[in-house]
């Protein structure tokens, strides 16, 4: 494994008696797109501020390319930040906004012009040098803010919820732009968001956070398909989460029935939680279903119907189907063993990863 670009070792951050970060361990490699994902107040922006040098860790080590940088001033770090509100100067034109950091560093005028033009070309705003900020759309203003950060040639770009102020269509377009930009530049991006769709769409790796802890890290596919606990399963996409009991390896009891699953290595009769994603549930005839449910409501979402149904024990089931159903209709539900994800209570990420690796070795 290559040396991490940024590394946290047991980083704790306190404000008086309030512990914001509770022993964070994480590593960011060169040239990858990382996302800190979690609800408001979970500590994700605090991590960004510590990396940028805007605040200090209360304890623990923050390393940059293997060197401790806890006490390194913000202006000495090869890091730049794009803020949620872009922090552009309305009285300066595009060129002067992008050049602002370079001028503070007293970069030669000829080099400033070259770096500004290159940065604007990177974000596809070549020729916009003399535009006023007020003449730009929200997406263009965001790209100016990114160009200003890139003009300083950082090794790590920090992005603090930069898409949150944009409308949905523009936000999705900017997801493509940011991902493409990161791949073209080959530098490390660390993106902060509470929007799981943004995280899944753009990231090489996601850190899911809650209450000052990193609960799970991994690729978007790994975290979506194999959530470690109830919080992650519920926060990453929509889920049916039900109590269950392991009967034996590859067999689990849900709603009083035994189903095949892809999980093993647990104690017989161990209490667990089960995740079934709505898109993995197929509506079939009642006599072909593994479960029978009664349709309660449905909403048309454009490319699928979101159907809410209940079984005889009043367990709620969320189903995503391309075919509509009728309110009050009884239908069967069918799913494959690999669609059943079993979560253990209190399992550490290390033990969880080891369990998943053991399945792969068996295959």
Curated annotation (Swiss-Prot):
It is a peripheral membrane protein. This is Spermidine/putrescine import ATP-binding protein PotA. Belongs to the ABC transporter superfamily. Spermidine/putrescine importer (TC 3.A.1.11.1) family. Pfam families: ABC_tran, TOBE_2. ATP binds at residues 38-45. Residues 6-236 form the ABC transporter domain. Part of the ABC transporter complex PotABCD involved in spermidine/putrescine import. Responsible for energy coupling to the transport system. Keywords: ATP-binding, Cell membrane, Membrane, Nucleotide-binding, Translocase, Transport. GO terms for molecular function: ABC-type putrescine transporter activity; ATP binding; ATP hydrolysis activity.
